[in-house]
Amino acid sequence: MERKPFETEQANVVQSLGISALPFYGLARGFLSGKYRPGVSVESVRAESVKEYQTDKGWKVLEALDHIAKAHGASLSSVALGWLRSNAAVSTPIASARTVEQLKEIMQVVVLTQEEVASLNAASL
């Protein structure tokens, strides 16, 4: 969700050096898992730091993720990680899990179409 610094400055450097990036907050501190929604209170140690994503842009991204996840029969987390993997400058997105269920969600592999990637990119700008 914090794409501008990477895409406007760092991605070109990474690619010119022939290396790749490892995004640390691949699920935007859990926001892209879909558990944070308007009007929903979430008990989490990350809840306060996730507030920065709870904006019109953030809700648009979740809406796009919802649509794509439904089409693939997949979790929002797996779609969000697939979105990161679609970026040529990213080798491996990093995501953490606290439960077995969360681990199962992030282990799903979702390959997105160009149209789906474009939809997510448009929502996040």
Task: Report each predicted region and the residues it spans.
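Beta/alpha (TIM)-barrel catalytic core signal, keyed to glycine-rich beta->alpha loops juxtaposed to Asp/Glu
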Residues: M1-L125
